[in-house]
Amino acid sequence: MKTWKLIVLVAALLVIVILGAVGGRWYAGNRKPNFTGKADLYVRPQMTVDEVLAQIPDSIVVNRHNLSRVVRKELADSDLKPGHYVVEKNKPSVYVVRMLKNGWQSPVNLVLSGTMRQKGRIARKIANQMMLDSAEVADALNDSLLLVGYGFTPSDVFSLIIPDTYQVYWTASMKDILDKQKAAYDAFWTDENLAKAEAQGLTPKQVSIVASIVKSESNYAPEYSSIAGVYLNRLHQGMRLQADPTVAFCYGYTLNRILLKHLEYDSPYNTYLYEGLPPGPICVPDKPSLEAVLNPDRHGYLYFCANAAMDGTHKFAATYSEHLRNAREFQRALDARRASGR
């Protein structure tokens, strides 16, 4: 009888030990925190589980063996859903499985900023931050049928883009991104801003065209309103804008220096040859340049040229003779700088 009781006791202890081991293993995979930091995972189509796991650095993993065992047991390559995922601090290994299997994506910041004046470069800027291919982005920016749904054309699509930081899913389509841009565009064009544009005799798209020239003329934002005032004065007086950046646009921004011969390039974008505004923006205008056109300085200036101080500012003039003096002053300063080898 005692022997039988001993056997039962030993068997019970073995069951407890086994259950404890199984329970401990379950706890390690399903409840015990296994990450000491965050990691970004980017899952592309056709990726394998091993390729995804390789994106999690050892430095934030408490138990790599546990992570590999749990994920490989519960997740097949075919279960992976493309997207951007974030491994959070203090999460258990099984969280990675659930996140990837259920497609619990985390949005990314799509940053549209800096100089954006060529569709190819804009396409690369977007593609570098998204799962999209740059050719797919470029095609969308030239797709008349797609853009007409937003009220734009390939010629004026730069007007639609409002530089900012946008939260989007990494797997977003170009239509998703354009939807975001249209929402931002509509948000910018409040009743107040529409009234300001109308007061200047401009449509919103025309404001973008002038703003693109203003932005292309200077990197010094405090001068934007003064430069905008010059171009609006010329426009209202029926003068040709004679904006050098429009010539640079005609040559695909390949010129190091604009010469007199370049001013003869026959294009509706060449404001030396054609009166009024070009057909579309010559770059993506930012909010400061748009606001400068809506709130221009009130002055009588019709000309401006680079300041002889070479500090990125400009000198403004109301008459052509005054402008020529400023231009000669700048040329002398430029010649002196070249002579000194600076």
Residue ranges and their predicted role:
Residues 7-10, 37-40, 78-80, 119-121, ...:
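Short low-complexity stretches enriched in small and charged residues
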Residues 1-38:
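N-terminal type II signal-anchor transmembrane helix
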Residues 11-16, 58-59, 82-84, 136-141, ...:
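N-terminal start-of-chain detector that recognizes signal peptides
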Residues 48, 131-135, 146-342:
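Bacterial extracytoplasmic/cell-wall-associated proteins, especially those involved in peptidoglycan
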